[in-house]
Regions:
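Anionic, Ser/Thr-rich low-complexity intrinsically disordered regions
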Residues: 1-93
């Protein structure tokens, strides 16, 4: 369990980083598009790139959600192990 948990936690750290970086890239591209518009330049390619960045960000967010669910499921499975009932002592009613 510890190995699987550690693996999921490591993957979650990477997924969090991807979401953070993806958000920064989307914000930066929006700023770039605004600058192009302000300068009366074409935004066609920049807008296409923005759509790709947004799609990539969404995939990273979905991956992070999947990892969080898997980690929660693993934690729940081992948090409260089901105990077997104790056998009655000999001679007890």
């Amino acid at each position: 369990m510890d190995g699987e948990r550690r693996r999921l936690e490591d993957l979650l750290v990477v997924a969090d980083r991807h979401v953070k970086v993806g958000g920064v890239l989307v914000d930066r591209q929006c700023t770039n598009i605004a600058a192009l518009r302000r300068d009366a330049q074409s935004t066609e390619l920049a807008t296409k790139l923005l759509a790709e960045l947004e799609q990539s960000l969404q995939l990273h967010i979905e991956d992070r959600k999947r990892l969080r669910r898997a980690l929660a499921k693993l934690s729940a499975r081992y948090a409260s192990p089901k105990r077997k009932p104790r056998p009655k002592a000999l001679g007890a009613n």
